[in-house]
């Protein structure tokens, strides 16, 4: 295997510099949910005694945003995403308060995409209408399945009928709706996974995300693993999902993302193209670029601690610069998830590094049939997309196993 070129040998002691800053998104984390799912490794928490300190948390978010302004001064927001947890547990009044503050404090691109995640078990028609009035223009529903037996196995609080009903209500209020679905579920058959994806297609939503269930560390499923489809069956499910969605007019523009024409997730595309994002709220992550450095941040994870630290104007638990030996891998780890890959010039625009810094790795990936490239673009091949971990491992700074 070809050895990695040391970036210090390419650049000497000169620090890489960005000549232009990438697009900037805003991520807002609302960490509470009705019930923690056994497969979930996100920063989500069941409220103590069922009570969410909603007003205090909204005030903390706005304070957090105000304190972050010097890092992003003058930069326009291209998208906003309310993630969780279950953001739809919050009132439309609170969402409106947060968005009003964001619009007051930050310049916005014309008609930014503003997404809110919702759980089918917390769907109310009036509430969705009020979310739209507050400024939400894209809804992401955590359906996971339309099969009640599988939903019960996943520990979800809704059943198949509620999944269908939630989509109907969402579509009455929003033109842009994403459904999160999962496959390779406990005891799931190929036919059952096909039924889920076909049902989603008949609803005609603008976007579908299809995720392979994985047993993440620090989850109940990791401690007590359920019986899951084997790798061969899971691969059959993935191929069948891709073929079914393609036949219904959806473009598989990213590993797990499928959209109707021109309705890709703008927020997630910014992530995948190594754009910037300011994350506020408990456990939220940020990536912020400056001309001479790229910084990653994480807010305090526990809601109670985040509230206390935000009141002291110290919400950051961790902050570090992305080393120049890490920038190439971080860019490729995201951009190679995209079916269309990336424009070659974007590598230098987003990392500050010449693309020659990863020339040997590109050569190796091409020789192994994992990417195709010309002087304009680098694109993962179908083989590279299917064996993405093998492709990404080529670009690891020290060749750690993924």
Where are these regions (language model features)?
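N-proximal helix/coil linker or "cap" segments that precede and/or mark the start of modular domains
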Residues: 1-7
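C-terminal scaffold of the Radical SAM
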Residues: 9, 13-16, 21-25, 43-71, ...
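Local cysteine-cluster metal-coordination motifs and their immediate loop/turn environment
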Residues: 29-44
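Pocket-edge structural micro-motifs
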Residues: 30, 280-282, 382
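Short amphipathic alpha-helical interaction segments
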Residues: 352-364
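A short, conserved structural fragment
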Residues: 367-376
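Minor-groove-contacting beta-hairpin "wing" of winged helix-turn-helix DNA-binding domains
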Residues: 377-381
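Short, amphipathic alpha-helical interaction segments positioned at domain boundaries
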Residues: 383-402
């Amino acid at each position: 295997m070809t050895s990695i070129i040391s970036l210090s040998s390419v650049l000497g002691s000169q620090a890489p510099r960005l000549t232009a800053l990438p697009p900037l998104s805003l991520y807002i984390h609302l960490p509470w949910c009705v019930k923690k799912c056994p497969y979930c490794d996100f920063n989500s928490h069941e409220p103590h005694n069922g009570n969410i300190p909603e007003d205090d948390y909204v005030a903390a978010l706005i304070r957090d945003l105000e304190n972050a302004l010097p890092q992003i001064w003058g930069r326009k927001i291209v998208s906003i995403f309310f993630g969780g947890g279950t953001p739809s547990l919050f009132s439309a009044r609170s969402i409106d308060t947060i968005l009003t503050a964001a619009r007051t404090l930050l310049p916005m691109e014309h008609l930014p995409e503003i997404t809110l995640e919702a759980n089918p078990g917390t769907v109310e028609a009036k509430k969705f209408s009020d979310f739209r009035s507050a400024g939400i223009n894209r809804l992401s529903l955590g359906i996971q399945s339309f099969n009640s037996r599988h939903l019960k196995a996943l520990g979800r609080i809704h059943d198949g009928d509620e999944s269908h009903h939630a989509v109907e209500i969402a579509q009455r209020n929003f033109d842009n709706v994403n459904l999160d679905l999962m496959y390779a579920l406990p005891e799931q058959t190929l036919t059952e996974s096909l039924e889920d994806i076909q049902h989603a297609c008949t609803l005609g939503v603008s976007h579908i995300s299809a995720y392979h269930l994985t047993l993440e560390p620090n989850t109940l499923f990791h401690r007590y693993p359920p019986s899951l489809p084997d790798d061969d069956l899971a691969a059959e499910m993935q191929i069948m999902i891709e073929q079914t969605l393609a036949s219904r007019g959806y473009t598989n523009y990213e590993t797990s993302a499928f959209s109707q024409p021109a309705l890709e997730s703008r927020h997630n595309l910014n992530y995948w193209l190594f754009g910037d994002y300011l994350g506020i709220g408990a456990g939220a992550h940020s990536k912020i670029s400056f001309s001479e450095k790229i910084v990653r941040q994480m807010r305090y994870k526990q809601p109670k601690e985040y509230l206390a630290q935000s009141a002291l104007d110290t919400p950051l638990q961790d902050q570090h610069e992305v080393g120049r030996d890490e920038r190439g891998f971080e860019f490729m780890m995201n951009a190679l998830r995209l079916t269309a890959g990336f424009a070659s010039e974007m590598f230098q625009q987003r990392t500050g590094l010449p693309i020659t810094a990863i020339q040997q790795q590109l050569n190796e990936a091409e020789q192994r049939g994992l990417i195709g490239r010309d002087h304009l673009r680098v694109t993962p091949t179908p083989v590279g997309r299917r064996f993405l971990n093998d492709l990404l491992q080529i670009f690891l700074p020290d060749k750690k196993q993924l």
